[in-house]
């Protein structure tokens, strides 16, 4: 399965729109995009998962690592466009309490 990734850089944040399936095979593609952003440490990151049809624990792990790196620079990770199914993953793992997870797609 292919992963579609679109990025936009704003003054105070990066926006990353993801489409497809986030799993052990495709997460490295997203990691290549997120790594320089989180290493930059000057902006929050908004990840829009509106067009993600499936996500496994590999995707969750990537977001935990991204959040940890961002928090070292007092920056935040926002997960937007979360479906009920993917939102449930964040909820049952307790990650919904650690990061900003929202069903909406509006960037603040």
From Swiss-Prot:
<dbReference type="InterPro" id="IPR002645">
    <property type="entry name" value="STAS_dom"/>
</dbReference>
<keyword id="KW-0597">Phosphoprotein</keyword>
<dbReference type="Pfam" id="PF01740">
    <property type="entry name" value="STAS"/>
</dbReference>
<feature type="domain" description="STAS">
    <location>
        <begin position="3"/>
        <end position="108"/>
    </location>
</feature>
<dbReference type="InterPro" id="IPR003658">
    <property type="entry name" value="Anti-sigma_ant"/>
</dbReference>
<feature type="modified residue" description="Phosphoserine">
    <location>
        <position position="57"/>
    </location>
</feature>
<dbReference type="InterPro" id="IPR036513">
    <property type="entry name" value="STAS_dom_sf"/>
</dbReference>
<comment type="function">
    <text>Positive regulator of sigma-B activity. Non-phosphorylated RsbV binds to RsbW, preventing its association with sigma-B. When phosphorylated, releases RsbW, which is then free to complex with and inactivate sigma-B.</text>
</comment>
<dbReference type="GO" id="GO:0043856">
    <property type="term" value="F:anti-sigma factor antagonist activity"/>
</dbReference>
<comment type="similarity">
    <text>Belongs to the anti-sigma-factor antagonist family.</text>
</comment>
<protein>
    <recommendedName>
        <fullName>Anti-sigma-B factor antagonist</fullName>
    </recommendedName>
</protein>
């Amino acid at each position: 399965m292919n992963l579609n990734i679109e990025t936009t850089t704003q003054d105070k944040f990066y926006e990353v729109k993801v489409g497809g399936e986030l799993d052990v095979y495709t997460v490295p593609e997203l990691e290549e995009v997120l790594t320089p952003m989180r290493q930059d440490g000057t902006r929050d990151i908004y990840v829009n998962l509106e067009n993600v049809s499936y996500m496994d624990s590999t995707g969750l792990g990537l977001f935990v690592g991204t959040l940890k790196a961002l928090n070292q620079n007092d920056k935040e990770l926002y997960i937007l466009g979360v479906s009920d199914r993917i939102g449930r993953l964040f909820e049952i793992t307790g990650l919904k309490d650690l990061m900003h997870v929202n069903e909406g797609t509006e960037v603040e």
